[in-house]
């Protein structure tokens, strides 16, 4: 008779353990936060859309009447840059890059004259042409504005220095059959930029970046202006307030 209660107790204990096991529910796995932080390499290609604030020379003040028929501008030009950056967290990063901005053709047209008995007498015109290029060094900071399915909009700003070079400059005065040339000259300027764009994370390490930048590149100037036969030398031509609207396609490669 003793064996029956023992067997019954064993059955009761086993059924209780099985019931308790049925009640246990394994907790859901906790989401793993994405990894941020670390160095990255960056590179980009793009096109510039540049503007000129003004073209200035001391001789403009030596004539009674002077006006621009075409105030001057630059053609679009290619650009390319490489750099290195650091991602501090999921919303803040910074980088520095060096960028070469290729030759952009320049043209402008003015005329000058004096007051005659019947009104303005135009004495001549100046047809200006040349090319401009830059080497740009810039440090930037960016704020990533959220993350949606691998897409990250961002805004940023940067400061740096731009080495602006004017080359192949010439001034052709058709009415007087005069031609002058400007030597190639380069000047360093303070530069600043505002950035905006959108990035797409292709892999854990690779991110594509489509961006826009407003660039303020400072000023530039030619070398001394010389007549075609070297008989006359004048001061350089000055290019004031050079700006650009840049479109760039680039990548970022994480080193972490």
Task: Tell where the protein language model's regions lie, with residue ranges.
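Sec-dependent signal peptide recognition
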Residues: 2-8
């Amino acid at each position: 008779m003793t064996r029956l209660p023992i067997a019954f107790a064993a059955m009761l204990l086993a059924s209780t353990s099985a019931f308790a096991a049925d009640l246990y529910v394994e907790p859901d796995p906790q989401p793993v936060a994405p990894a941020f932080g670390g160095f990255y390499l960056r590179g980009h290609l793009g096109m510039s859309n540049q503007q000129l604030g003004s073209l200035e020379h001391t001789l403009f003040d030596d004539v009674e009447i002077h006006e621009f028929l075409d105030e001057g501008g630059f053609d679009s030009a290619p650009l390319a840059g490489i750099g290195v950056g650091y991602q501090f967290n999921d919303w803040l990063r910074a980088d520095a890059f060096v960028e070469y901005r290729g030759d952009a053709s320049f043209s402008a047209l003015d005329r000058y004259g004096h007051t005659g008995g019947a009104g303005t007498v135009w004495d001549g015109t100046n047809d200006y042409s040349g090319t401009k290029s830059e080497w740009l060094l810039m440090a930037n900071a960016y704020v990533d504005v959220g993350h949606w399915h691998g897409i990250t909009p961002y805004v940023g700003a940067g400061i740096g220095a731009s080495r602006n070079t004017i080359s192949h400059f010439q001034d052709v005065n058709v009415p007087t059959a005069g031609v002058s040339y400007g030597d190639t000259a380069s000047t360093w300027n303070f530069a600043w930029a505002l950035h905006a764009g959108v990035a797409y994370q292709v892999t854990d390490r690779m991110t594509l970046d489509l961006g826009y930048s407003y660039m303020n590149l400072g000023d530039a100037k030619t070398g001394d202006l010389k007549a075609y036969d070297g008989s006359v030398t004048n001061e350089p031509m000055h290019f004031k307030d050079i700006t650009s609207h840049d479109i760039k396609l680039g990548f970022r490669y994480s080193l972490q």
